[in-house]
Every structure is written in C-alpha cells, then in structure tokens.
UniProtKB/Swiss-Prot annotation:
Entry keyword rRNA processing: no
Source organism per UniProt: Penicillium expansum
Cofactor: Mg(2+)
Family statement drawn from the similarity comment of this UniProt entry: Belongs to the terpene synthase family.
Protein name: (+)-aristolochene synthase TS1
Length: 331
C-alpha cells in the first residue's frame, strides 16, 4: 500500500477562498486518521482516465483537462486502499461515471435529472440494452455487466445503494429549507454512504452478514456525517459557482456550510471552521464506537476490516477534497 504524506496530520492554516484549504484563515485541529492509497493508483488512474477520455463525450478540450485534474480514480484509490488488485478498476470506473453524471445534473431541472437517472437504472440492472450511440448508456451497461461477470452476487448488492444515491441527487428535498440535522439525514443518501460501503465490500471481496451490518449502524451513520461535511467544507466554492451558473434547481446551493452560517449568524469561513471541529469529534466518536464493539466481543475479522475501511473512506475523502482541482478552480 502507498501511504500518503498526511497533510491532515499537521495543523491546517491558509488564507484566501478556494486555495485548497477551504478558505480557512485560522489553524484547524489535526485529523486523527491517516490516509493510505491503493498501490496500483498510478496504473489504474491512467487506465480509467484513458477509457473515459476515449468514450465520454466531453464538449471541449478544457473539460477533458478538467476531468483529468479532478482525479476521480485517485479518490477511489484513497477510499479503498485495501481493494483487491483485480477489483479496484471496477470501483474507479463506477465512481468516475457517477461523478460525471453528477456534473451533468447541475445543468438540469430536478425533473429532467430524475428522468435522466431513471433511464439508467434498468440499464444498470441489465434489464434494458443500451443505445450504443449514447456514451453514458453503454458505459453504464458495460461496467455493470463486467462487474457481474467478476462477482455477480456482490455486484448486485451495490445496485440498490446506487439507485438510492441517484434518486437522492434529484430529490426535491435539496431545494427546500433544512436545519443541520435534517440536512445530514438527507446527505446520508446524497453522499452515497450506502453505495460506498457496498462498493468497499465488493472491492475487498469482504462478506459481512445482514446481522453484522445492523450492528454497524451507528458507526456507519457517524462516518456518513464526516464524509458529507468534509465534502461540503472543501467543495463550497465550487458549489457556490454552480449555484450562480448552472440550473436553478440542479445547481441549487445545498450545503451544511451555508446552513450553519445562516442558523448561527456567522461567516462562511467561521462555519467551515466549526464544521471541521465537528468532524474531529466524529473521528473521536468513531474510535469510541469501535472500542465498544471490540469490548463487547462482537468484532469479527470481517467487521474489523469493515470499520478500518470506513476510516480510510473518511481520511481518503479529506485528503482528496483538500487537493483535488475539482474544488480548486485551477483548470
């Protein structure tokens, strides 16, 4: 495995909005978690990027460069550093196509976006053949067929979480006023936590029983909050730009940063700082919950691997969010 130089292990301090530090002007507490990257990251990134540059219909050379700079395979390799070598490419391709679709949805109404995603659902199941002249259709179909060819049972376990995520993307909840608590409940679906958990299990060939998943419920929810809020903190400038340039519904600003700033009557930068402190508390909470699981004698080998995988998702998400050019308007 490739251990990342842990930029989270030092106190973060930066000034200026969109500088890669979320616009912070004061030191932030260090993360308790250490990111690790999959050892095949360089090879897989090249393979996956080349595939999408060949098959996806990018409207311009600028957008092709922006796609490469976003480094979607890189974040997948940070999410799942313990993925099997013959499965990490599947995970990279799935998250990449979902990111690309997410960008398209910003320029659609919620109704248009819902129709777009709903058309892809039976294609993903293999119930409907794709239109080979439409890249998103055949990319989606071919990916799911190849995943099922590799491990039909575990691939099919990812389907429903993906559909929940896709429907959350166009849920009208996102354009309604929300408090922080209800927002985090919505984001558990929109950030794709169940999707990431199922994809982690597939990528690691990690078999966890339904009973064990129930035991992990609170740990999963805690992780979801961390993923959602870190994403919000570092993507705020990107989402703000989208709210001004994209569709009024698809690009609507839906973020814990704005919600907390409005509720507490504090600045955006102050809201970001408070949210990062909250994430550090969720990291502590994760450690407490894992220790309770161990103390109760309920932590099997599969559960140990699962909860460690959640740590890598949290640390990997933060590492990528702080460095990706997707959130820093360089390209």
């Amino acid at each position: 495995m490739t251990r990342m130089k842990n930029s989270s292990s030092n106190v973060t301090s930066a000034s200026g909005s969109g500088s890669g530090s979320g616009g912070f002007v004061q030191p932030l507490p260090a993360s308790l978690l250490q990111p690790i990257c999959h050892p095949r990251v360089t090879e897989v990134t090249s393979e996956v990027n080349d595939y999408f540059l060949t098959h996806w219909d990018f409207p311009s050379e600028k957008l092709r460069k922006k796609f490469v700079a976003a480094d979607f395979p890189g974040v997948t390799c940070l999410y799942f550093p313990n993925a099997l070598d013959d499965r990490i490419s599947f995970a990279c391709r799935l998250l990449t196509v979902l990111f690309l679709i997410d960008d398209l949805l910003e320029f659609m109404s919620l109704e248009q976006g819902s129709a777009y995603n709903e058309k892809l659902i039976p294609i993903s199941r293999g119930d409907v053949l794709p239109d080979r002249s439409v890249p998103v259709e055949y990319i989606t179909y071919d990916l799911w067929e190849s995943m099922r060819g590799h491990d039909r049972s575990m691939a099919n376990e990812i389907l429903e979480p993906v559909f929940v995520f896709m429907r959350a993307q166009t849920d009208r909840t996102r354009i309604r006023p929300m408090g922080l608590g209800s927002y985090l409940e919505y984001r558990e679906r929109d950030v794709g936590k169940a999707l990431l958990a199922a994809l982690m299990r597939f990528s690691m060939a990690l078999h966890v029983s339904p009973v064990e998943l129930t035991i992990l419920g609170e740990i999963d929810v805690n992780c979801s909050k961390h993923l959602s809020v870190i994403n919000d903190v570092y993507s705020y400038e990107k989402e703000l730009r989208a709210s001004k340039t994209a569709h009024a519904e698809g690009g609507a600003l839906c973020t814990s940063v704005r919600i907390l700033a409005d509720e507490m009557a504090i600045s955006i930068e102050a809201a970001k700082r408070v949210l990062v402190f909250m994430c550090r508390e969720w990291e502590l909470r994760h450690q407490v919950l894992v220790e309770e699981l161990r103390a109760d004698g309920r932590q099997s080998a599969s559960l140990t691997a699962y909860v460690k995988g959640l740590e890598f998702q949290m640390s990997g998400n933060e590492e990528w969010s702080k460095t990706t050019l997707r959130y820093n308007n360089v390209v």
